[in-house]
Amino acid sequence: MLTQFSLDMREAAQQYRKPISLARNYYAEVALNPQSEEWFAQSIPNGLQNYNWVALMAMPYMENAKNPTKWLNHLIDVTQVTPLAKQKLLYELQAKDWRTNKPIPTKELSSWMRMMRIRGIHNFGYYPDDQFTNTPDMQILKKELSAKAALQ
């Protein structure tokens, strides 16, 4: 229902501006627990088929994961078998632990990005970015976000 509403909105807006790309944020739980598709009105296969991008909240601390890297690897395993995932699924990493209100250590965030690149995933980002405190530290992250890193 929400997907169709988004598509209808795009169609209405395209009379004023073309092309219009659509993206939608999805909870990781939708990938990890098929029953939750109904709770959240989200389906990754449906989203990948209908949207230009699906941003998946790959946020292990928000999900209370005991081992964040293992949790992320499992999320990748589950999602990358879905058709169109390699092209259209974007993993949104967390840069802040909202439970403690503290930033995720930049080296940990960087290691997640490196792990994703090693696994062949190039569509990832992070949230939030605090440019006033340089959190996460861009000198460290740019090594993982640069075009040079993508070619390695």
Stretch-by-stretch model annotation:
Residues M1-F40, K86-W98, Y127-D129:
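Aromatic-lined carbohydrate-recognition surfaces of secreted/lumenal glycan-active proteins
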Residues P45-T69, N73, V78-Q152:
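Substrate-binding cleft of secreted/luminal carbohydrate-active enzymes
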